[in-house]
């Protein structure tokens, strides 16, 4: 099941602009909100964890951050969520983040997650080199290719993606780089 992570939950509650301004002007208030958002994430996930249903957390808003900001405003709250879920029997969670997050890749193993789903903007070979020994990688066939491509070009995109990631030490799963667009042909 997919849930929003603490940072995006906080951004949905307060607004992205307010969150970004608070990172400079009201860190204490933002940390309180993020702690609250982490508590929400923990409780929303409780029944899924207790029933051994896998959870993937998404943080589309966090792609706006620098590695330093990510370490301060995202990672501590993921660690809090993962630690609690692991107490309840979870083996960990997957994580998806939108956009070109190459600059953030090296921070992901600090989150306590099992794997990362990366957007098509990130080169799988680079992700594998940076975090493949610590995390499973999922991705990252272009949703635009899936929407607009021919069956042959989509197949080639899947093959190209697989060739880059199949030997990731912690595992690799072929998947779209983000959602499959709703207008995608069933063909």
Label every model-predicted segment.
Residues 1-187:
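Active-site loop segments of alpha/beta catalytic cores
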